[in-house]
Amino acid sequence: MLRTVKLNAGYKELHILFDVDADIKKNSITAVVGPNGSGKSTLLKSIFGLATVHSGQVFLNGGEITSLPPHTRTKLGIAYLPQTDNVFANLTVEENLKIAAYTVDKEEVKDRIDAALDAFPELRAFMKRKAGTLSGGERQMLAMATALVRKANVLMLDEPTAQLSPKFAEIIFDRILKLRDDLKLTILLVEQNVQRALEISDNAYLLVSGRVAFNGTANELLEHEKFEKLCMGIVD
């Protein structure tokens, strides 16, 4: 469904990723793991059009999207949710959801918002509250709900449980699984809790210094005899 081919990317003249080949399967969760500075977030940003692609290609459903701007990729069904600043803090929950529906036909808006709230029912109690007053976990739910309103079918999450309590982090992990299982989304996950990310993922890519050091099933990486060393970037 989503592929990168010999992707070399970074920011202006700075090169972060080198010859990254990735093949993200439809209706799956793929974890992108690796030590700090390995290029995990840059890979997501490259797919969404927020990083500089020096060479290589990005494909969605067989069509090349390498040169398309982010707003066009959004219309094609790709959603990228960064760790912070992923909602409009000064607007209410309801307003955030309505803004997410700006490209939706008027007669569909209510149904889209209702469907998103069905996936994240906790938000119904906060519709008139400013997003900035929500807890970190509630804001993350709102961000994912806005992606559903936009009818995203590829959801890229950049450290969605960062700074959340263990209890709320588990709620977010559970919702990620339900987005795959119930709504058939394709999810690309960068997560600081590597162990938990791999436990809920189908497949995994390990990046070390901007290069793919491992790709396979998440279980294969979890059970690798050098798992801890690999995740620290120690590759023999």
Curated annotation (Swiss-Prot):
Stated role: Probable component of a branched-chain amino-acid transport system.
Family indicated by similarity: Belongs to the ABC transporter superfamily.
GO MF: ATP binding; ATP hydrolysis activity; branched-chain amino acid transmembrane transporter activity
InterPro entries: AAA+_ATPase, ABC_transporter-like_ATP-bd, ABC_transporter-like_CS, BCAA_Transport_ATP-bd_LivF, P-loop_NTPase
Record bears the keyword Transport: yes
PROSITE patterns attached to this UniProt entry: ABC_TRANSPORTER_1, ABC_TRANSPORTER_2
SMART domains: AAA
Cited Pfam families: ABC_tran
UniProt domain ABC transporter: residue ranges: 2-234
Protein's UniProt name: Probable branched-chain amino acid transport ATP-binding protein LivF
SUPFAM superfamilies assigned to the protein according to its UniProt record, in alphabetical order: P-loop containing nucleoside triphosphate hydrolases (SSF52540)
Residues that, per the record, bind ATP: 34-41
Keywords: Amino-acid transport, ATP-binding, Nucleotide-binding, Transport
